Amino acid sequence: MPYAKGEGPSVVIALGGNALGNTPQEQLELVKNTAKHIVDMVGDGVNVVVSHGNGPQVGMINNAFAYAAANDGKTPEMPFPEAGAMSQGYIGYQLSQAILNDLKARGIMRSTANVITQTLSLIHI
């Protein structure tokens, strides 16, 4: 029988951005595989928090907007903090969706939540 929230230990899993692949399709496949392992833990009663990096992904978003801005004249460049938020959003969405799909398939009634962080640029004068 699936465990209810709070019955087991709590763990934090840190996924580096490089662990998520180099293309959107590769990332989706790796996220689905990772979700299975996370749900294994949840099924064993573990409360899981997942933290992830986004270095390669934010770089790809930033480069794509820079390329579009340079080549079509209509697309503005994306500021780096906003590109970071975009990458956090889509990585969080893919992770949550994959985890929720696996939880549902196993009959485990748990939910997910995503938190987008903000990049602060401090200038010392």
Put a short name on every predicted segment.
Residues 123-125:
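Conserved small/polar residues in nucleotide/adenosyl-binding loops
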